Amino acid sequence: MAPTLLTTQFSNPAEVTDFVVYKGNGVKGLSETGIKALPEQYIQPLEERLINKFVNETDEAIPVIDMSNPDEDRVAEAVCDAAEKWGFFQVINHGVPLEVLDDVKAATHKFFNLPVEEKRKFTKENSLSTTVRFGTSFSPLAEQALEWKDYLSLFFVSEAEAEQFWPDICRNETLEYINKSKKMVRRLLEYLGKNLNVKELDETKESLFMGSIRVNLNYYPICPNPDLTVGVGRHSDVSSLTILLQDQIGGLHVRSLASGNWVHVPPVAGSFVINIGDAMQIMSNGLYKSVEHRVLANGYNNRISVPIFVNPKPESVIGPLPEVIANGEEPIYRDVLYSDYVKYFFRKAHDGKKTVDYAKI
């Protein structure tokens, strides 16, 4: 039998939705009311819940790559191999100062610990900029079952724009996180590009691979019935590359291309989790894989993560790169306007890998 909401604060599901979504309390606010059972709108269909027997059955693990290895060719080979076989890998000794990572994680907690009146200033209805958005779940109006996550989404336009519109309490730390990560991001994209016969990351390719940046500050509060819901549902990212900083709680799972199992990505202190996005899969004509992943809810700890989504410019047209199909390889994707692709992704609920079909020939 489905659990019911065991608190007198809400008399029906509509009141929960109003409290969480429209009044800006998020699931953090809901969790802090002391609810003892999961509201019905968060209960996922059975097939969307992650059953333990499908996790790590084969002791699979995504690759961990040491970027300080002096053999540059070896590092590049490991990155490209992981991009082809896993679509995910972790990097250590990446050159981003650890204090920068600690600072942005602390700033994430500070933002979500603000009074709801302060956070509400950044909801879709109240934000002074379309580049700043505080919200909950993924796409509440399109979802049959909501996800147990709150977020602050920050689309980087310029430091001046960020100074004007981003929340004071996390702005400087997030900008520093972006700036200190750029060298590593460029290095990874150069490796991936050279393997696609892209000789250099010139201005045109830079615009295509990393022309826009979005950062999310994600918050996954303690959940009363974590086995019945998800923090984030099955999906692949629409980015070229995603750079994920996670705390020590864990919960990220990746679908193995080899076995189909869900594989936990254990937190490694000071590391980043890197994953290929749909845009890179399309531009590589399917050589690099954007892979399904999801995040579990948990009943013991509040969790945060801070992904940087490295994207083409919205006005870019993405399709198989000329360098990839120059030798006669048949394109399996058509050219699409990147902003159209992103709009298609965000107007529906998470649905695994279906978004990339939008670009298939």
UniProtKB/Swiss-Prot annotation:
Report the record's Gene Ontology biological process terms.
Answer: coumarin biosynthetic process; hydrogen peroxide-mediated programmed cell death; phenylpropanoid biosynthetic process; response to iron ion starvation
Tissue specificity note: Highly expressed in roots, especially in the cortex.
Indicate which residues the UniProt annotation says bind 2-oxoglutarate: 220, 303, 305
Catalytically driven reaction(s): (E)-feruloyl-CoA + 2-oxoglutarate + O2 = (E)-6-hydroxyferuloyl-CoA + succinate + CO2; (E)-6-hydroxyferuloyl-CoA = scopoletin + CoA
Q: Which cofactor does it need?
A: L-ascorbate; Fe(2+)
Pfam family name, one: DIOX_N
Q: What domain of life?
A: Eukaryota
Limits of the Fe2OG dioxygenase domain: 204-312
Under the heading InterPro entries, the entry gives: DIOX_N, IPNS-like_FE2OG_OXY, IPNS-like_sf, Oxoglu/Fe-dep_dioxygenase_dom, Plant_2OG-oxidoreductases
Q: Where does Fe cation bind?
A: 235, 237, 293
Summarize what gene deletion causes. No visible phenotype, but severe reductions in scopoletin and scopolin levels in the roots. Compromised iron uptake from an iron source of low bioavailability; this phenotype is partially rescued when grown alongside wild-type seedlings, presumably by secreted phenolics and flavins. Loss of fluorescent coumarins (including sideretin, scopolin, scopoletin, esculin, esculetin, and fraxetin) root secretion in response to iron deficiency. Impaired iron-uptake ability at elevated pH (e.g.
Recorded effect of pH on activity: Optimum pH is 6.5.
Give the enzyme class.
Answer: oxidoreductase
This entry's comment on induction and repression of expression is: Up-regulated by 2,4-D treatment. Induced by iron deficiency, mainly in roots.
Give the cofactor note text: Binds 1 Fe(2+) ion per subunit.
Could you tell me the keywords of this UniProt record?
Dioxygenase, Iron, Metal-binding, Oxidoreductase
**What pathway is this protein a component of?**
Phenylpropanoid metabolism
GO molecular-function annotation terms? dioxygenase activity; metal ion binding
Signal sequence range: none
Enzyme Commission number(s) from the entry: 1.14.11.61
The function of this protein is: 2-oxoglutarate (OG)- and Fe(II)-dependent dioxygenase (2OGD) involved in scopoletin biosynthesis. Converts feruloyl CoA into 6'-hydroxyferuloyl CoA but has no activity with ferulic acid, feruloylquinic acid, caffeic acid, caffeoyl CoA, p-coumaric acid, cinnamic acid, cinnamoyl CoA or benzoyl CoA. Required for the production and secretion of compounds (e.g. fluorescent coumarins) that facilitate the mobilization and uptake of iron from sources with low bioavailability or in high pH-induced iron deficiency conditions.
Q: Family assignment?
A: Belongs to the iron/ascorbate-dependent oxidoreductase family.
What is the protein name stated in its UniProt record?
Answer: Feruloyl CoA ortho-hydroxylase 1
Q: Which organism is it from?
A: Arabidopsis thaliana (Mouse-ear cress)
